[in-house]
Amino acid sequence: MSAEPLLTDLDRQTIAVSKALAADAVEKAGSGHPGTPISLAGVAWLLYQREMVHDPADPGWLGRDRFVLSIGHASLVQYIQLFLAGYDIDLEGFTAFRSPAGLPGHPEFGEVPGVETTTGPLGAGFANAVGLAMAARRE
């Protein structure tokens, strides 16, 4: 009996595209942080595709899992996965990353579908995640 591989060819290709998209968005913007989005591409892909319960058609669904990116400067990790999962994010948002017409440099609640909370200062996401978890207990 052979074990099913952790990553399929499609997974590997999608992770490679995620890394390229992160590098291209930062290069086009002329600023940003490509390292974390590139290094976390595989982990983020597996989380969004295999572990997290969420619905791109209903980002505010109460039964969803919450993803809080505490290191907001690595926002492309989240934006790319939201895009690939089918959330209402245009590819053009990546080409105008960190500009008024594109995706924000840090996750901003209400600006990007699927972003649970605004993060920017390092560590702020931890407090936000605890608050979201406490609130979820009462839903």
Q: What kind of region is each of these model predictions?
A:
Residues 9, 32, 119-122:
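Conserved, non-catalytic sequence blocks in retroelement Pol enzymes and Pol-derived host proteins
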Residues 39-139:
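Cofactor-binding active-site loop characterized by glycine-rich and histidine/acidic residues
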Residues 10, 14, 35-36, 70-71:
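Secondary-structure capping and boundary motifs in well-ordered enzyme cores
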Residues 1-12:
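Basic/polar N-terminal segments that are highly enriched at the extreme N-terminus
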Residues 17-31:
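N-terminal capping segment at the start of a domain
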